[in-house]
Amino acid sequence: MEIAVIVLLLLGGVMIYNHVYRKKMYSEIDRLEAWKISIMNRPVPDELSKVKQLNMTGETEQLFEKWRQKWDDLVAVKLPDVEEKLFDTEELLDKYRYAKAKAVLREIDQLLRQAEEEVQLIIDEVHELIGSEEQNRTEIEELRTMYREAKKTLLAYRYTFGVAAAKLDEKLEEIESKFKQFEELTASGNYLAAREIVLSSKGELNKVTEMMSDIPELLTECQTTIPAQLEELYDGYKEMKQEGYILDHLQIDREIVQKREKIEQCMQMIGDLQIEEAKQGITEIKEEIDTLYDLLEKEVISHHYIKTEMSRIEEMLNELNEEAKETSEETLFVQQSYRLSTKDLEKYRSIEKQIHQLMKRFEIIQARILEAKTAHSLLKEELEQLLAQIEMMKEEHEEFRKMLQTLRKDELVAREKLDEMKKKLSEAMRLVQKSRLPGLPKSYELQLSEAKDSLMKVAVRLEEKPLNMSAVHQALEESGNMVQRVYERTVEMIEQASLVEKVIQYGNRYRRRYPSVKEGLEEAEFLFRHYDYEQALEQAVAALEKVEPGALQRIQQIFRDERSKEE
């Protein structure tokens, strides 16, 4: 019973699926049928009838026949074939050959897609042809108007076009011949070819119109403006030479000849209607003329600079030379009291030598100015370099003078430092006396003696004539380090001695109970009486820490508290 139910359900499912699938396939057939009908109803015949209104010869006739044949082939062959395939699909569905039917439907879809593209191509090409004819009629009239205006302008103002007039005539004649060619192509039905003529004529005419706009101005530049600039430049050049300017290095004569040759080349370019090349050439000529003007102006500015700066530079040099002489005398005087390093002496000799060289260079420039054979711009550059070196020498010379002045200041500072170190050493000795130590370690006495000797060496260095400040500074540094070490050790030694006493006093409470403490404290006392305070402290602390760990920290705190109260 259950099996029968399952079989019935399966059969029912198959029947439902079969029904739904067949319905879907028939819907696809209906869609393709509607598509086929829409293609057949496209207005191709109407579009082709518009073509018949044109001149049905030549290219137009050939295109019309091509389009008509394609349409006839679609209507008579390809679309009926589609219709037949649709019927075949229905028969396949009736026989439940769904896979085959689906393949045929895909084929029909592809055929209709191709047919749609062919129809659209026919319509687009027809529109292009008809549109070309309409555009041609409109644009050719505009071009004829432009042509007549250009012809009229060339005739009325021919003199303004000069050498280019003949070539412009030729260009306009070429355009006129294209108009005739356009008429012939249109009459023979070759509208697309005629369209190409319209486009090329439009480009040529626009180009000619632009040339006619530029040529008069370019000719004015070549025939009037630039020659006038060259004359003005040459007159200025001659006037400057008469005033004594040295201008041979600019080669103005040769430059002007070259510019005139370039003008002739530009005129030839204009005559050949190479307008862009002529524009570029004229621009280059004008830039080169501006450069020549700039060079002449540079000579004028340089002349003014020399005229105004020579006396100032001479005054600066003389002032520097006088200061150097004073510094030389000051150096000799300083050397009586201070010993200058070889490096410092070499530096000063170098400064003297360079100042002498600067004086010689200035004299040479003066002579060249009087000789009047060197361009002012070159002399100006040399003077600027000389001025920069004078400024540099002034700085170096000032640094050397400051160094001499610093020597005396350094001596005073060194004497002050010596006094400070003596006071510091005396303070250390006062602290020792105040502490009432039983005695001093041999190593400390030796260190103290060395510090005193080092202070004596500094004092001796400061009394030398001439005074060697480099040696003084070295002796000061060594002595300062020694005094500082003595002072630090003094403070440390006094603190250790005081702390030993505190530790022993604190540890006395354990003497009777702990023999080890008694023994350790006795050893510490022995070391203390022999002035070894550091070892005494270590011995006392070691003995005490065995019975009371952390005792040292507590004693140190007590020690610090007592010192704070005393202060």
UniProtKB/Swiss-Prot annotation:
Keyword Transmembrane: yes
Coiled-coil ranges from the UniProt annotation: 97-188, 254-465
Name this polypeptide is given: Septation ring formation regulator EzrA
Function summary: Negative regulator of FtsZ ring formation; modulates the frequency and position of FtsZ ring formation. Inhibits FtsZ ring formation at polar sites. Interacts either with FtsZ or with one of its binding partners to promote depolymerization.
Principal location class: membrane
Gene Ontology CC terms, in alphabetical order: plasma membrane; septin ring
Membrane topology: Single-pass membrane protein
Residue intervals annotated with topology Cytoplasmic: 22-567
One GO BP: septin ring assembly
Extracellular-side segments: 1-2
InterPro entries in alphabetical order: EzrA
